[in-house]
């Protein structure tokens, strides 16, 4: 069990005001005194009002509002090559002060229509912070015969893509679970990172997080810098285990595929209360670990390694 981290909060300073009484000269009107006191009181009132107004941040406009909003067209402003088959794409908002409107955990639906063909739709989870104004970032791996990933990787800066959302996945609440486990493969890390970052960003949330992340090679590990930063900042609450199918000679992490033995070692036991296991990755990972989803709204039967280890359907969520 990880030790819980204690947070201390600074108490806001309270301002105190002294009251002064002044005796008016005899035989003269008290009106100037009342006027002075009244104006002083008004000044204090305005100061307090303006201070409170300044301290309360204005709610930012949301780009995606769901419902019948329809598609939102965004311009691609930056492209960053992460490795041989993965890029980070930054799409900017028309309103540079607006935020995406996504919550945790949720995704966006993307759409493009090839010339003479049918529209292609694919969901993606942004890796940028939900409170980040002005833009959103997608991390996308290109797959052979993957029409949306191939389209994204062929895009140039200033081209545009249609988005719709948010698509709610799992309604997270602070301290909803005592311990969560994230089992990911490849770009399946994106919703896991969204969730982990949100947990550690909230000082009220004391949830412990274990990540098991499988990839082919070391260069395929996405968001490694961000994950290491979380682990270094919250060593008592966040543990990451990396597994490589084709590791270098000096690799000290897991080798091969995410195995039953590894999960039995690093995950909390099924009998522990208030735990949740999240799974996201390619079809082969779902098949081996938890079984595939039937549809976005149907989690399907729990099978695979997690079933063999004794976890229940209610303890597992498939992104």
From Swiss-Prot:
May mediate the reduction of outer membrane cytochrome b5. Disulfide bonds: none annotated. It is a single-pass membrane protein. It catalyses: 2 Fe(III)-[cytochrome b5] + NADH = 2 Fe(II)-[cytochrome b5] + NAD(+) + H(+). GO terms for molecular function: cytochrome-b5 reductase activity, acting on NAD(P)H. The chain crosses the membrane at residues 30-46. Its cofactor is FAD. It comes from Aspergillus terreus (strain NIH 2624 / FGSC A1156). This is NADH-cytochrome b5 reductase 2. PROSITE patterns: FAD_FR. Belongs to the flavoprotein pyridine nucleotide cytochrome reductase family.
């Amino acid at each position: 069990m990880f030790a819980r981290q204690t947070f201390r909060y600074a108490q806001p300073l309270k301002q105190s005001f002294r009251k002064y009484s002044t005796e008016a000269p005899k035989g003269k009107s008290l009106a100037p005194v009342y006027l002075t006191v009244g104006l002083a009181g008004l000044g204090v009132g305005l100061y307090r009002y303006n201070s409170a107004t300044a301290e309360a941040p204005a709610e930012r406009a949301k780009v995606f509002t769901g419902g019948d909003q329809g598609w939102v067209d965004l311009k691609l402003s930056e492209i960053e090559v992460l490795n041989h088959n993965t890029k980070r794409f930054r799409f900017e908002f028309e309103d540079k002060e607006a935020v995406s409107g996504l919550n945790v955990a949720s995704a966006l639906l993307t759409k493009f229509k090839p010339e003479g063909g049918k529209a292609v739709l694919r969901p993606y989870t942004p890796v940028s912070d939900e409170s980040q104004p002005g833009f959103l970032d997608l991390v996308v791996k290109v797959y052979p015969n993957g029409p949306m990933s191939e389209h994204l990787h062929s895009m140039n800066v200033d081209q545009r893509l249609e988005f719709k959302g948010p698509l709610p996945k799992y309604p997270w609440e602070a301290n909803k679970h005592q311990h969560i486990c994230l089992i990911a493969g490849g770009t399946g890390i994106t919703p896991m990172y969204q969730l982990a970052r949100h947990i550690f960003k909230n000082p009220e949330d004391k949830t412990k997080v274990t990540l098991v992340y499988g990839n082919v090679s070391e260069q395929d590990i996405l968001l490694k810098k961000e994950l290491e930063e979380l682990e270094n900042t919250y060593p008592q609450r966040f543990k990451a285990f990396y597994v490589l199918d084709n590791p270098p000679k000096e690799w000290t992490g897991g080798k091969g595929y995410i195995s039953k033995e590894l999960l039995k070692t690093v995950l909390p036991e099924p009998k522990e209360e208030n735990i949740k296991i999240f799974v996201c990755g390619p079809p082969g990972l779902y098949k081996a670990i938890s079984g595939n989803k039937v549809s976005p709204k149907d989690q399907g039967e729990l099978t695979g390694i997690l079933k063999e280890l004794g976890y229940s359907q209610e303890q597992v969520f498939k992104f």
